[in-house]
Amino acid sequence: MSATTANPPANRGSVLIPLVLSELRMFVRGKAGPIFAIGLPLALLIVFGNIPFYNEHRSSLHGYTLLDVYVPILTAFVLATLAFNVVPAALVGYREKGVLRRLRTTPVGPVRVLAAQLLVNLVTAAVSVVIVLLVARLAFGVALPRQIGGYLVGIVLAALALMTIGLFIAAASPNSKVADGVGTTLFYVMMFFAGLFLPIGVMPSLLQHISRAAPLGAAVQALTDATQGNWPHPVQLLTLVVYVIVFGGGAVRLFRWQ
């Protein structure tokens, strides 16, 4: 009687790393993701920075300029673009083309697929945020975040919260049209509550309360606090953690190969 030896399970890292590198190559080749996630917020910063109206110190903004206020919002813009437009389109596109179905026969599981997308977009977000902050500082004199620790905690939680929402959209959407529609709608709604069209500080009281509960609004307020030298309010950070848990768990639960 001959003994049979079972194949050892694939090392998780050996599966995830090539998957992340493959996703990163496809993201760069697609061009649309880098253009919208890196090029567009940088272009908006340059446009705003060259308009005198945005560089006037205002008593209504506690002595800050509109450009000072808009840099954290542009940071949120980066995260929202990736989370609501890039992530759902990529994953739903893979599902419709049968890529996910083929991956099902490999050691790759749904958690690794979602993790690879999350990592690629987090790296992209980090690059874009650093570029925005440096250009704002060097070209327009906008101060760098004064509370570095609080800023890092805020940006990481904001990125995770928004990316898990994007993964949830991808997992729950039956096709790319639905994913695009939901993602685009959420993008504009969330950017409104982030203060892109109307600074949060001058919103009516009701809208300010809604903004604090919205993921992007909580993110902008946390980043603004840290930029001004304060530790983000615990409620803002807790709000982001709740979004990570709820939508991250929902994305894994609803994930479909085909």
Description of each model-found segment:
Residues 4-15, 19-97, 111, 117, ...:
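Transmembrane helix-boundary elements of multi-pass transport/secretion proteins
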Residues 23, 46, 133-138, 167-168, ...:
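Alpha-helical transmembrane segments of multipass membrane proteins
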Residues 49-53, 89, 93, 102, ...:
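Transmembrane helix-loop junction
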